[in-house]
């Protein structure tokens, strides 16, 4: 095993009173909550791209991070070194999963044969490292947005040759995901949108991306992939307006192309912020529509209008998110993937550990708080009581289709219905949630 992070042997759980910065205070993977271990509930994954590919660059400055694998003259040699160091990190952190884009793990090329050679070379290494360490692939995906060929979109591109290139990448990445035992395959349309309607045919582009998703579903069945297909919603950035704006928009798209039973959503907290929603709202919408799949765990900055991809640090926000997930029965094939990056000034390699340790503790503590809310059922009882009328005769008659508008008008008139407003008790419920958060 690589020994890049030689100052750490293994991050362990030491409890809330520990002062060791390289120990978990709340994340105890073997602790049983609601019949499952914390590890089974959270299904944590480290992402390859932000953790091992980002150089620390931004729009106003060059890379600030010193990473040995990014300095090799031979990019494939660097990719091999990166894989070794990545699995050292996964093992020492103790996460069960990881995730990647195709070009995160292997050098890209404008020559497809060279792309395949590079990619397959690294997939061979990943397969071996998974076998050696027991670390599994939560999901794989293809980067169909960074290369200049995709500046006008991938599946939505006005040039069908670009569509074909994207299809070739997804074909390759899906096959690799299946080979590596990946439990999901993600589709994020980073360039599937537009900058201006002056040069855009919305109807045509929507039909193109719809056909692309149908091709992905067809290939899933052709190769016997048992995982879940996921679309990741985002309203904008890098395009002005993206077609997968939010969970509700994605559901409408899936319905249009008959894919609502084939594809679910991978929800990112920061993307919810950009869409003007809370993280909790997007999860609740997905579970209510039956398309909840997985989570990209991070946070945004409400004062900034871009995807900051910071590590989650709010127990309050994540307890409410976890509550919605637990109410829906928890994850099946999905999990919490840390789509988050350290800050540009966090140049010490061990800052990667601090970031992930803190985020894992936040999610574990949020799980415990949400589980207590589920066990007590106090909040749910208030909601059930609020809608109790719909379980009674009039409510059931309306929902079952046994009452027309005329019937309802007669009921109001003959029975003299005069419903009175009932308190929503928002302040009480907010206090109730705080009593779980800060006990």
Curated annotation (Swiss-Prot):
Name the reaction it catalyses: alpha-D-xylose = alpha-D-xylulofuranose
Q: What positions does UniProt annotate as the active site of this protein?
A: 101, 104
Q: What is its EC number?
A: 5.3.1.5
Q: Which Gene Ontology molecular function entries are recorded, alphabetically?
A: magnesium ion binding; xylose isomerase activity
The main place the protein resides is cytoplasm
Please indicate if the UniProt record lists Kinase as a keyword: no
Intracellular or extracellular location(s): Cytoplasm
InterPro entries associated with the record: Xyl_isomerase-like_sf (IPR036237), Xylose_isom_bac (IPR013452), Xylose_isomerase (IPR001998)
A biological process (GO) of this protein is: D-xylose metabolic process
Read off the PROSITE patterns from this record: XYLOSE_ISOMERASE
Q: Which UniProt keywords apply?
A: Carbohydrate metabolism, Cytoplasm, Isomerase, Magnesium, Metal-binding, Xylose metabolism
Binding locations of Mg(2+) 1: 232, 268, 296, 339
EC class, as a word, reads isomerase
Instruction: Cite the cofactor comment.
Output: Binds 2 magnesium ions per subunit.
Q: Name one GO cellular component term.
A: cytoplasm
What cofactor does this chain's UniProt record say it requires?
Mg(2+)
Q: Which residues bind Mg(2+) 2?
A: 268, 271, 307, 309
HAMAP family assigned to the protein according to its UniProt record, in alphabetical order: Xylose_isom_A (MF_00455)
Please report which protein family the annotation says this sequence is part of: Belongs to the xylose isomerase family.
> Assembly and interactions?
Homotetramer.
What name does UniProt use for this protein?
A: Xylose isomerase
Protein species of origin: Histophilus somni (strain 2336) (Haemophilus somnus)
